[in-house]
Amino acid sequence: MHSPVLLLIDGFNLLSRGYFATSYGKDEAQLPRNEAGYYINALRVFFPKLFQLIREHNVTHVAVAWDVKREDSHRRQAFAFYKASRGELPEALIEQYETATSLLEEIGVAQVTIPPYEADDTIGAFACRWAKEEKGHCFIYSNDRDLLQLLSKSTSQIISSKGKDLIYTEENFRNDYNISPAQWVDVKALLGDKSDNIPGCPGVGEKSALPLIQQYGTIETLYEQIEDLDPKYKRYHKKLVAGEESVIISKELATITTEIEAISSFSLNSLVLTTPADLIIDTLARCGIRVKLAPVQTELKLG
């Protein structure tokens, strides 16, 4: 019996990528629907990918993490500008989110939403608990680079690029960036994130943010030594001083919560998928979705 393997899916990241990849250049009237009249273009990406990952990585435990409503997240409650620039979602995507959650429940795949936390936090708390309890390896499936801060010897991120999946490990990260995954939030604090409306430090870009953290380690150490800044960074001195408050807030926003009480007491047994394969296939087929399954494993039971 091999070691247990946990798969954590960033639900809306996968669903929305599936939606936009298959709806480009089309209006909603052109999108495929099933016999019941429900949109299924994103679902036809979501479910096959879910079960492909389960097959390929010998997954024994799986959870799909969903975000709370944007306005209900603890980050938005603390900072009104967080994600404030994002537009409304297409109705066809919202409908498929509702269909996805119903189907996942019907086929017995665990779903987790814990207000006021975002999916990143839920994933972070599960990954850290899994690592601490030495259960086995954890794979995070998402293209969200914020999650890179969670990489460890027992946690890898699966990133899709050009139709292929890349397993990105802690070793890959250290080789690419010459910092630890935990320092990624410090880089993000300086860079900001336009998609999430995280400000960062105006005037400090990719060419300087990473080298600054490589040299100073954290933004806290950087600001402790701001008046003795290395001469090669002197041109950023005024910008860093002026942007200090923004940088501190940005780090708070970029830091994933890894301690959530509800997850600390969560039964890991509930993440084991025990639904018979034929029932899963038939349930999804009735909705117009085809999937390929490996035999469902039921023998691994954890606390």
UniProtKB/Swiss-Prot annotation:
InterPro entries: 5-3_exonucl_a-hlix_arch_N, 5-3_exonuclease, 5-3_exonuclease_C_sf, DNA_polI_H3TH, FEN, HhH2, PIN-like_dom_sf. It is an enzyme of class 3 (hydrolase). Keywords: DNA-binding, Exonuclease, Hydrolase, Nuclease. One of its GO terms (biological process) is DNA replication, Okazaki fragment processing. It comes from the Bacteria. Gene3D superfamilies: 5' to 3' exonuclease, C-terminal subdomain, 5'-nuclease. The keyword Nuclease applies. Residues 179-262 form the 5'-3' exonuclease domain. GO terms for molecular function: 5'-3' exonuclease activity; 5'-flap endonuclease activity; DNA binding. Its EC number is 3.1.11.-. 5'-3' exonuclease acting preferentially on double-stranded DNA. PANTHER family: 5'-3' EXONUCLEASE FAMILY PROTEIN, FLAP ENDONUCLEASE XNI. This is 5'-3' exonuclease. It comes from Halalkalibacterium halodurans (strain ATCC BAA-125 / DSM 18197 / FERM 7344 / JCM 9153 / C-125) (Bacillus halodurans).
